[in-house]
Curated annotation (Swiss-Prot):
Cellular component annotations (GO), alphabetically ordered: cytosol
Enzyme class of the recorded protein, top EC level: hydrolase
Obligatory cofactor(s): NAD(+)
Origin species: Methanosarcina acetivorans (strain ATCC 35395 / DSM 2834 / JCM 12185 / C2A)
Entry protein name: S-inosyl-L-homocysteine hydrolase
Cofactor note: Binds 1 NAD(+) per subunit.
Length: 411
């Protein structure tokens, strides 16, 4: 494609996403009028695709100068990146298929604008800021983190006293994790798997590693597709939930012998390792829906393999002698590396939270550390979403409010 064709393709994708994100459209309209980010610079490291572009446009509409890089080497859509880079007050440094050094060079370019506020998905930008660009920290008003993995990293930094800026854990907003993590991941992970493999899910044994909100979504949609779902967990409460939800629950060592499709959703490393590869059924399909490519031990699988070949676009077959293991998108985030990511209507809420939290940081002084999304923002996003769906709900009467705050009424 020519440069112009790329830009036109990106613009078309962005328009489609924009038309299905009514909440952030309302926020953008307010930002355009009020300019709450005027004079501020926002540095971002997110998955550069159409929905993200709508968020970037919204921040720029609010008066910000925005620079963005990718947060995964395989999740950038180059046409959207090119289209973004044509916008006023927006610089995009993301590129699909970049190597590790190029990935961090792009993050460095984002930091070169000396941002006042950061937005991360996985905390790589904040990591770089704290490790190599500490001179920029005094200027930082705060940051936002989009995903579970990034929030875990930030809590670890905070615990060690290493976090030198305030960060709002947008992932922990109810209007984020209850919808984005569950319904978004559930749909988009299977979209990536199905469009890449073109295999039937019904009747197959599907092993879901982890039963957090992402794992719940993946398991729920697998069951809806007719799979026999097996869940593995380390948390006894979540394992019990999975069983009560109707799924088989067992150790991965046992599930590995049964699974035909494996989807990891833990945000942790070494969920599928050499001991599991050696006993998997011939032709097993492996996909990761966690942020980083550490859940499937690709180094171990590569060392076991007698040969590796591409058998379909975005699928590599590892022949380990007596069986073949198929890995989608090199074990990277399957819904974005092999698909278009979460549905626009879900990201509408997640990115509405991001935009409003950026404004909150701009208008308030926060202490260093990890902060929750203000309840008012979370509730406001839910109300706007309901309104966009044409849904009205009840309100408490004064008597009901009194009852809920009192203690004297009993039997």
């Amino acid at each position: 494609m020519t440069e112009q064709e790329l830009v036109e393709s990106g613009n078309m994708k962005m328009e489609w996403a924009r038309n299905h994100m009514p909440v952030i459209a309302i926020i953008r309209e307010k930002f355009e009028k009020e300019k709450p980010l005027k004079g501020l610079k926002v540095g971002m490291a997110l998955h550069v695709e159409a929905k993200t572009a709508v968020l970037v446009e919204t921040l720029a509409a609010g008066g910000a100068q925005v620079a963005i890089s990718g947060c995964n080497p395989l999740s950038t859509q180059d046409d959207v990146a090119r289209a973004l880079d044509t916008r006023k007050n927006i610089s995009c440094f993301a590129r699909y298929g970049c190597c590790t050094s190029e990935y961090y060079e792009a993050i460095d370019k984002v930091l070169d604008i000396e941002p006042d506020i950061t937005i991360d998905d996985g905390a790589d930008l904040i990591f770089k800021l704290h490790k190599e660009r500490t001179d920029l920290l005094p200027k930082i008003l705060g940051g936002c983190e989009e995903t579970t993995t990034g929030v875990h990293r930030l809590h670890a930094m905070e615990k060690e006293g290493a976090l030198k800026m305030p960060v709002i854990a947008v992932n922990d907003a109810m209007t984020k994790y209850l919808f984005d993590n569950r319904y978004g991941t559930g749909q988009s992970a299977w979209d990536g798997i199905n469009r890449t493999t073109n295999l039937l899910v019904a009747g197959k044994n599907v092993v879901v590693g982890g039963y957090g909100w992402c794992g719940r979504g993946v398991a729920m949609r697998a069951a809806g597709l007719g799979a026999n779902v097996i869940v593995t967990e380390v948390d006894p409460i979540r394992a019990l939930e999975a069983r009560m939800d109707g799924y088989r629950v067992m150790r991965m060592a046992d599930a590995a012998r049964l699974g035909e499709i494996f989807v990891t959703t833990t945000g942790n490393r070494d969920i599928l390792t050499a001991e599991h590869f050696k006993v998997m059924p011939d032709g097993a399909v492996l996909a990761n829906s966690g942020h980083f490519n550490v859940e499937i031990d690709m180094e171990a699988l590569t060392s076991l393999a007698k040969s590796v070949k591409t058998v379909r676009h975005n699928i590599k077959e590892y022949d380990i002698g007596d069986r073949r293991i198929n890995v989608i998108a090199e074990g990277r985030l399957v819904n974005l590396a092999a698909g278009d990511g979460h549905p626009a209507e879900v990201m509408d809420m997640s990115f509405a939270n991001q935009a409003l939290c950026v404004r909150y940081i701009a208008e308030n002084t926060l202490l260093n550390g990890v902060h929750g999304v203000p309840r008012g923002i979370d509730t406001y996003v839910a109300k706007l979403k309901l309104e966009s769906m044409g849904i009205s709900i009840d309100e408490l009467t004064s008597k009901q409010e009194c009852y809920m705050t009192g203690w004297e009424c009993g039997t």
